Swiss-Prot record:
One of its GO terms (molecular function) is structural constituent of ribosome. Residues 21-32 have a biased composition (Gly residues). One of its GO terms (cellular component) is cytosolic large ribosomal subunit. One of its GO terms (biological process) is translation. Part of the 50S ribosomal subunit. The gene is rplO. It comes from Maridesulfovibrio salexigens (strain ATCC 14822 / DSM 2638 / NCIMB 8403 / VKM B-1763) (Desulfovibrio salexigens). This is Large ribosomal subunit protein uL15. Residues 12-52 are annotated as: Disordered. SUPFAM superfamilies: Ribosomal proteins L15p and L18e (SSF52080). Belongs to the universal ribosomal protein uL15 family. Binds to the 23S rRNA. Coiled coil: none annotated. Keywords: Ribonucleoprotein, Ribosomal protein, RNA-binding, rRNA-binding.
């Protein structure tokens, strides 16, 4: 037995449709493209968004809103996630968070308050939610907010 003899058998494989090979095949002559017109030409046809000349949907609907170029997006990390990744540590810097792969390097980090803080710990991040700050300080630690 050779590789080319293994399943699927030749009879089970569907032959591709060969067009333009005589009228007896059922796909001769115009090869299923009809007579003349844009769709009969090579490379012919209209793009998927073309609506036949009527005013396109994107132009019928009004413009709305804008994109703020100065928007800052923060990666949200819960206190529980951070402490779970750094068990036994008392100081967790932003660089540590990046190195551990909790978020991409250079991302703005906001710490949220879901999870338990049992020991005093110092955490560095760009922002802290009120609940996160409360939990960290209640356990005797500090929430160090960075600039930028």
């Amino acid at each position: 037995m050779r590789l080319h003899e293994i399943y699927p058998f030749q009879e089970e494989r569907k032959n591709r449709k060969r067009v333009g090979r005589g009228g007896g095949s059922g796909w001769g002559g115009t090869s299923g493209k009809g007579h003349k017109g844009q769709n009969a030409r090579s490379g012919g046809g209209v793009p998927a968004w073309f609506e036949g000349g009527q005013m396109p949907l994107a132009r019928r609907l009004p413009k709305r809103g804008f994109k703020n170029p100065f928007r800052e997006e923060y990666v949200a990390l819960n206190v529980g996630q951070i402490l779970g990744a750094f068990e036994g540590r008392t100081e967790i810097s932003l660089e540590d968070i990046y190195e551990r792969g909790l978020c991409k390097k250079g991302a703005l980090v906001k710490v949220l308050g879901m999870g338990e803080v049992s020991a005093a710990v110092t955490i560095e991040a760009h922002r802290f939610s009120a609940s996160a700050t409360e939990k960290i300080t209640k356990a005797g630690g500090t929430a160090k907010a960075l600039e930028g």
